[in-house]
Design a protein with these regions (language model features):
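Alpha-helical structural elements
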Residues: 9, 23, 56, 149-153
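Short alpha-helical scaffolding segments that buttress acidic/His motifs in well-ordered protein cores
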Residues: 5-8, 51-59, 135-138
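Charged substrate- and nucleic-acid-binding regions of tRNA-handling and nucleotidyl-transfer enzymes
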Residues: 13, 88-192
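Helix-loop elements that line ligand-binding/catalytic pockets
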Residues: 16-96
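Glutamate identity and glutamate-enriched acidic tracts
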Residues: 6, 22-24, 35, 63, ...
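Single conserved hydrophobic/aromatic residue that forms the stacking wall/gate
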Residues: 1-13
């Protein structure tokens, strides 16, 4: 084969070599992948740190959710059991250093914890070494969703305020009659 022909084949199949999921599968997945790549470009241009583990976690998030969905809800057992198979499938395409495996899993697990904002859980989540990366992924997930929720706004306020205001934020959730949308995990587009 000529070099030109090989280049054309690589361009045509570029998604196949990047990630082991089908970002075109849903509009939400496509938006999330696009937002993750834009975010990485923006961070790179402004000389902020860029971690391959974060990008891989974001790109594989739709694949992980796809593996653990059951009747429009996340099956938590499947969620935890699906992490390693999703990473192994990706490693057939792209080498992922071992040190990033735990980093990626931490970001994914924190997505669950970011939805739990009662009691001392928000303080524990905020102190986690991977909080910032998980927070950024949650913002990308929220940005990719058409139905906006206040999760990103809440966490932004929680991390920027002092302890008294943090308590008020937690209490404001208690005072609200927590309807079903606060009790479920994920954004509606993720659960299709």
């Amino acid at each position: 084969c000529s070099v030109r022909r090989q280049r054309q084949m690589c361009i045509r199949d570029r998604n196949k070599f990047l990630i082991a999921n089908e970002p075109e599968k849903t509009d939400y997945s496509r938006k999330l992948v696009t937002e993750a790549l834009r975010n990485t470009d923006k961070r790179f241009k402004t000389n902020k740190s860029v971690t391959p583990g974060f990008l891989i976690a974001a790109l594989l998030w739709p694949e992980l959710l796809n593996k653990c969905l059951s009747k429009g809800e996340i099956n938590l057992k499947k969620f935890f059991r699906s992490m390693d198979p999703v990473l192994r499938k990706q490693q057939k395409i792209t080498a992922i250093p071992r040190k990033f495996n735990s980093y990626i899993k931490d970001i994914w697990i924190l997505q669950l914890k970011l939805h739990s904002r009662i009691g001392k859980q928000p303080y524990k989540t905020l102190r986690h070494p991977r909080f910032r990366a998980a927070y950024d992924l949650m913002l990308l997930r929220e940005k990719s969703s058409t139905k906006k929720r206040s999760l990103g706004k809440w966490w932004t306020g929680f991390q920027k305020n002092d302890d008294n205001k943090r308590k008020l934020l937690i209490n404001s959730l208690k005072e609200k009659d927590l309807h079903e949308s606060f009790k479920t995990f994920g954004f509606s587009e993720e659960l299709r």
